[in-house]
Design a protein with these regions (language model features):
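C-terminal amphipathic/interface module of NAD(P)-dependent oxidoreductases
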Residues: 174, 190-225
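NAD(P)H-binding glycine-rich loop region in Rossmannoid oxidoreductase-like domains
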Residues: 1-23
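Conserved Rossmann-fold NAD(P)-dependent oxidoreductase catalytic core, especially the SDR/UDP-sugar
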Residues: 8, 29-63
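NAD(P)-dependent short-chain dehydrogenase/reductase
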Residues: 77-126, 132-133
């Protein structure tokens, strides 16, 4: 069983913490219990970390800054109780969704289609990855019967500003407008500034390495992102 459903944004979890806990923690506990005798993969997040150091490994202690991160960290502990189960921490995933408004990359395209400018942080760092690469990695982990904790993310640490520039280069006809900003000045929930993930552990067991976003975009010029 692969469990990737969630209240999946910081803002949504912060505005409705009870729902976030029911979906992210309680539902995970229920599903993990139902899957007690079979392999179970739970999708977690780089936002279980506080972002003070970056390049986090699987052995680093979590320290979430907000309700979303807290619920993911709590759910991880439930899944870890069963040695047959697996936790996959990932980062920003890009691609296309059924609704067209699920991912960071889709938010950018929608803004540009509406001729709106976008303010992107130069001081917040993640390891973005194409969702198809995440799916490939998880499928390989399942087929190899890997259990425990794995970081599955892009091989390149980028700021949101850098990510936006890479994506904008693909959508020049939309006349992308990007301005730099600072996460430390953001008035909303606290933001972890550098949750980049060290992916050495998973790279050592995959048939092909996970690429960085720049590398992936160059190798897949016609793939929507």
């Amino acid at each position: 069983m692969i469990h990737c459903a969630a209240v999946s944004t910081v803002a949504a979890a912060q505005s409705n913490p009870d729902l976030a806990r029911r979906v992210n923690v309680d539902a995970t506990a229920l599903l993990a219990g139902l899957a007690a005798d079979i392999p179970f993969v739970f999708f977690s997040s780089d936002l279980v970390f506080d972002g003070r150091k970056g390049n986090y490994t699987e052995t680093d202690a979590v320290n979430p800054l907000h309700i979303y991160g807290e619920t993911k960290a709590a759910a991880e502990q439930i899944v870890f109780k069963n040695s047959r189960h697996t936790v996959v921490r990932t980062s920003l995933n890009g691609g296309t969704s059924r609704t067209g408004n699920r991912g960071f990359n889709e938010d950018l395209r929608l803004a540009w289609q509406a001729d709106r400018g976008v303010n992107l942080f130069t001081d917040e760092f993640r390891c973005p990855i194409f969702a198809g690469e995440t799916a490939r990695a998880v499928w390989e982990l399942v087929n190899q019967r890997r259990t425990g904790l794995f970081h599955v993310a892009g091989a390149e640490k980028l700021s949101r500003w850098q990510i936006g520039q890479l994506i904008a280069a693909r959508w020049l006809r939309l006349n992308p407008k990007i301005t730099p900003g600072l996460a430390k000045n953001f008035p909303g929930p606290p933001r972890a500034l550098d949750t980049s993930l060290n992916i050495t552990k998973v790279q050592n067991v995959l048939s092909a390495p996970l690429p960085g976003l720049g590398e992936w975009l160059a190798a897949n010029p016609n793939e929507p992102f």
